Regions:
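N-terminally biased helix-coil "hinge/interface" segments that flank
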Residues: 1-262
C-alpha cells in the first residue's frame, strides 16, 4: 500500500491529504496558514491528516508541496534584491518587456560580449568590468541574473559569467539559457531576474518544510508542484523557483480532474 501525502499552502489555509495507491483519499485535514513561517502550518496540517488516517509518518512513500508563495511574491513585488548582468545588449533594451520595471531600481551592468544568431561571438566578454561590478555588489544583493545576447544559440558567455559570480561572490545566479529556450533576450532576462528574486524565499520554504516533515517522521522525498501541474524535485524547485509560479492553481486543477475522472 503506497501512501502519497499532498500539502497545499494557500493564503488562508494549509491543506493536507493522504491518498492510497493513487486511487483513494483516506484522509484530509486543514490548518491555518502561518504567513511568518509557512512550514509551521504545513506541520500542523500534516500531523492532523496522519492522526485522521491513523497511519504512521513512516508509511508515506512520497510527499508533494504546492504553494502560492512565488505567485504572491511576484504580484506583491516581494523577493530578494538582485543584480542583472546584461551581456551584449544596449541600455535601451532594458525598457523592453517590462524589464526595467521588474528591476525596480536594482543594480544592473551592461557588459561587452554576446553572440550573433548563428552562435558566433560578436565581442569578447569584458571580464575585468564584470569582476569590478561583482566585487562592488556582492554584499548588496541576494543573487544575480545573467542574460547574454543569443545565449540560447551559444551559452558560453552566460556560463562564464555564472562561474565568476560563484567565484567572486558565492551568491546564487540565474542564467537565462537554463530557464528559457526563447531567442528574445529581454524576455529571457526578465525570467532570470524574477527567478533570482524568488530563490531565497523558495529555498527557505522548502528547507523548513523538509525539516518539519523530518521531525514528524516523514522520510519520503519532497516533491514540488510546478506551474503546469507536474512534479519536480525539491532541488529543482530551489534552483528554478520561477517554475513554481501558479503551483497552487495548477494543483487545484490536477486535483479536480482526478476527483472527477475528467
Amino acid at each position: 500500500m503506497a501512501l502519497l501525502l499532498g500539502v497545499d499552502t494557500g493564503g488562508t489555509y494549509t491543506d493536507a491529504v493522504l491518498i492510497r495507491d493513487e486511487t483513494t483519499v483516506i484522509a484530509s485535514a486543514k490548518a491555518l496558514t502561518t504567513r511568518g513561517d509557512l512550514a509551521i502550518g504545513v506541520g500542523q496540517a500534516v500531523r492532523h491528516v496522519l492522526e485522521a488516517a491513523d497511519v504512521s509518518a513512516g508509511q508515506v512513500a512520497m510527499a508533494s508541496l504546492s504553494t502560492t508563495l512565488a505567485t504572491n511574491a511576484l504580484v506583491e513585488g516581494q523577493g530578494g534584491r538582485v543584480a542583472l548582468i546584461y551581456v551584449g545588449f544596449k541600455e535601451r533594451d532594458l525598457q523592453a518587456h517590462g524589464l526595467a520595471e521588474a528591476l525596480n531600481g536594482d543594480p544592473y551592468l551592461i557588459l561587452g560580449g554576446g553572440h550573433d544568431h548563428a552562435g558566433a561571438e560578436l565581442s569578447p566578454l569584458d571580464e575585468d568590468a564584470l569582476v569590478a561590478f561583482l566585487t562592488a555588489q556582492k554584499s548588496q544583493v541576494s543573487g544575480f541574473a545573467v542574460a547574454s545576447q543569443f545565449a540560447t544559440r551559444n551559452p558560453i558567455h552566460e556560463q562564464r559569467v555564472a562561474a565568476l559570480v560563484a567565484q567572486v561572490t558565492g551568491r546564487p545566479v540565474s542564467a537565462s539559457h537554463q530557464l528559457s529556450a526563447k531567442l528574445n533576450g529581454p524576455k529571457r532576462a526578465l525570467t532570470a531576474v524574477l527567478n533570482a528574486r524568488l530563490i531565497g524565499m523558495i529555498d527557505r520554504l522548502i528547507g523548513r518544510a523538509e525539516d518539519v516533515l523530518t521531525d514528524i517522521g516523514v522520510t519520503a522525498p519532497l516533491m514540488v508542484v510546478r506551474g503546469d501541474g507536474a512534479l519536480i524535485s525539491a532541488a529543482q524547485a530551489r534552483a528554478r523557483p520561477i517554475e513554481t509560479i501558479l503551483s497552487g492553481p495548477a494543483a487545484s486543477i490536477v486535483g479536480a480532474r482526478w476527483m472527477t475522472g475528467a
